[in-house]
């Protein structure tokens, strides 16, 4: 066990609501909702899927949880994982994937259901989508179901990626002509996701903005971690880094702390790092992958003090424009870390705050559920979904402070322009 870390301050988020589950969920049980709207889908082990959102009731914004009736999920089924994505333009529509194991007596039967409605006007209607199902029987036990956008010919395509105990990653791509999804060899589009010797517990595919390249990271049950730098145009693996850690890997996340935006002419090549959460070790960040590989390891102090780290998230949770690293544990603690780069000899992550819950934490999402421009932090625990919000008083003060700063900046710029004044008009010589 590492040394105990002391938080710099209290958690700035307040719990706005809690919705109890009828049965527990798991680390793969949370997904986003339709068409970028503020909605979450949470799956429970006993075959139930809840749609969670806020809506205007009697002139007040209130949380609403509704059970969605997805077809072809037997009452005795145990849901393993759920994922959603919006089709890549110019295609339209929301796609929902659910894996489950049906109780078939001595041996459970695993399935993948893919839901998608092709009727114009219903492409984003969850109730309609839930009735339009493709049912695929699996020959392996499923784990994480996720999605990735990939270049196919001259257009972008979003596909499902499903890890299994075979051990392999399976790819499911839409056949537009048949209006259904089909399994295709993963090596055709993701050559870096082959030759696995242990089940992948978490996969993260991160397309690098402004380029045709991506970083793919996977963490396995054996503790094996692999990161690959890939050029999508010619399916070339440019570089691969691997490391062996102790214990199963619960989460890998590729992220960039760089504030600069990449463009097509100036792709961002630096600043990509990797969060790795292990069930037996402290969570770590491997800093600056493209330049240092997995050589520069930064510890998240105290992350091993509260049992296993089960999930992580990299997002700007304190509204300062810089990303923080959140990790949530089986020991019922949510920990928030901030990178401090100076002084150079003590650079690393500091524990900003921690927050305790009443049951183990499984999954997280940072989404704008209320539609007010401020994102809420949704935390899935064994017992239900907690929605954490910023204090509206503090948020409004922050907005006013930044508006005043903008006004002062503009006044200063106008003042400089007035002092310089217009250039004198030159009269031609007579």
Curated annotation (Swiss-Prot):
<dbReference type="GO" id="GO:0032420">
    <property type="term" value="C:stereocilium"/>
</dbReference>
<comment type="function">
    <text>As part of the KICSTOR complex functions in the amino acid-sensing branch of the TORC1 signaling pathway. Recruits, in an amino acid-independent manner, the GATOR1 complex to the lysosomal membranes and allows its interaction with GATOR2 and the RAG GTPases. Functions upstream of the RAG GTPases and is required to negatively regulate mTORC1 signaling in absence of amino acids. In absence of the KICSTOR complex mTORC1 is constitutively localized to the lysosome and activated. The KICSTOR complex is also probably involved in the regulation of mTORC1 by glucose.</text>
</comment>
<dbReference type="InterPro" id="IPR028994">
    <property type="entry name" value="Integrin_alpha_N"/>
</dbReference>
<dbReference type="GO" id="GO:0015629">
    <property type="term" value="C:actin cytoskeleton"/>
</dbReference>
<protein>
    <recommendedName>
        <fullName>KICSTOR complex protein kaptin</fullName>
    </recommendedName>
</protein>
<feature type="region of interest" description="Disordered">
    <location>
        <begin position="410"/>
        <end position="430"/>
    </location>
</feature>
<dbReference type="GO" id="GO:1904262">
    <property type="term" value="P:negative regulation of TORC1 signaling"/>
</dbReference>
<dbReference type="GO" id="GO:0061462">
    <property type="term" value="P:protein localization to lysosome"/>
</dbReference>
<comment type="subunit">
    <text>Part of the KICSTOR complex composed of KPTN, ITFG2, KICS2 and SZT2. SZT2 probably serves as a link between the other three proteins in the KICSTOR complex and mediates the direct interaction with the GATOR1 complex. May associate with F-actin filaments.</text>
</comment>
<keyword id="KW-0472">Membrane</keyword>
<dbReference type="GO" id="GO:0042149">
    <property type="term" value="P:cellular response to glucose starvation"/>
</dbReference>
<feature type="compositionally biased region" description="Basic and acidic residues">
    <location>
        <begin position="420"/>
        <end position="430"/>
    </location>
</feature>
<keyword id="KW-0458">Lysosome</keyword>
<dbReference type="GO" id="GO:0030027">
    <property type="term" value="C:lamellipodium"/>
</dbReference>
<keyword id="KW-0009">Actin-binding</keyword>
<dbReference type="InterPro" id="IPR029982">
    <property type="entry name" value="Kptn"/>
</dbReference>
<dbReference type="GO" id="GO:0007015">
    <property type="term" value="P:actin filament organization"/>
</dbReference>
<dbReference type="GO" id="GO:0005765">
    <property type="term" value="C:lysosomal membrane"/>
</dbReference>
<keyword id="KW-0966">Cell projection</keyword>
<dbReference type="GO" id="GO:0140007">
    <property type="term" value="C:KICSTOR complex"/>
</dbReference>
<dbReference type="GO" id="GO:0034198">
    <property type="term" value="P:cellular response to amino acid starvation"/>
</dbReference>
<dbReference type="GO" id="GO:0051015">
    <property type="term" value="F:actin filament binding"/>
</dbReference>
């Amino acid at each position: 066990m590492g040394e105990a870390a002391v938080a710099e301050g209290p958690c700035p988020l307040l719990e706005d609501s809690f919705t109890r589950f009828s049965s527990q969920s798991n680390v793969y049980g949370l997904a986003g909702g339709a068409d970028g709207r503020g909605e979450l889908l949470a799956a429970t082990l006993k075959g139930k899927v809840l749609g969670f959102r806020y809506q205007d009731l009697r002139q007040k914004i209130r949380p609403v949880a509704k059970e969605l009736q997805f077809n072809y999920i037997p009452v005795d089924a145990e849901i393993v994982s759920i994922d959603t994505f919006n089709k890549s333009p110019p295609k339209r529509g929301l796609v929902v994937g659910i894996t489950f194991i049906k109780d078939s007596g001595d041996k459970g039967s695993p399935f993948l259901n893919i839901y998608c409605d092709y009727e114009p006007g219903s492409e984003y209607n969850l109730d309609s989508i839930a009735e339009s199902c493709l049912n695929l029987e699996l020959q392996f036990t499923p784990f994480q179901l996720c999605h990735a956008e990939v270049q196919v010919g001259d257009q972008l395509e979003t596909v499902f990626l499903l890890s299994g105990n075979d051990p392999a990653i399976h790819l499911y791509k839409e056949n537009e002509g048949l209006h259904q999804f089909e399994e295709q060899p993963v090596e055709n589009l993701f050559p870096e996701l082959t030759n696995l010797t242990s089940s992948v517990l978490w996969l993260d595919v991160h397309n690098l903005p402004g380029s045709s390249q991506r970083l793919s990271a996977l963490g396995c049950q054996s503790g094996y971690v692999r990161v690959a730098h890939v050029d999508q145009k010619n399916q070339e693996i440019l570089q691969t880094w691997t490391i062996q850690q102790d214990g199963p890997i619960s989460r890998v996340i590729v992220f960039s702390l760089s504030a600069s935006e990449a463009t097509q002419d100036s792709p961002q090549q630096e600043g990509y790092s990797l969060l790795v959460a292990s069930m037996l070790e402290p969570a770590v960040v491997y800093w600056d992958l493209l330049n240092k590989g997995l050589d520069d390891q930064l510890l998240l102090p105290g992350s091993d003090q509260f049992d296993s780290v089960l999930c992580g998230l990299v997002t700007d949770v304190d509204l300062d424009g810089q990303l923080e690293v959140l990790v949530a544990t089986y020991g019922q603690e949510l920990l928030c870390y901030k990178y401090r780069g100076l002084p150079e000899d003590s650079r690393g992550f500091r524990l900003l705050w921690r927050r305790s819950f009443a049951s183990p934490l499984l999954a997280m999402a940072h989404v704008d559920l209320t539609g007010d421009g401020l994102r809420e932090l949704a935390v899935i625990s064994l017992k239900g979904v907690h929605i954490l919000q910023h204090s509206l008083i503090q948020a409004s003060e922050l907005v006013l402070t930044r508006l005043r700063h903008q006004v002062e900046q503009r006044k200063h710029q106008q003042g400089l322009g007035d002092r310089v004044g217009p250039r004198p008009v030159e009269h031609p010589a007579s």
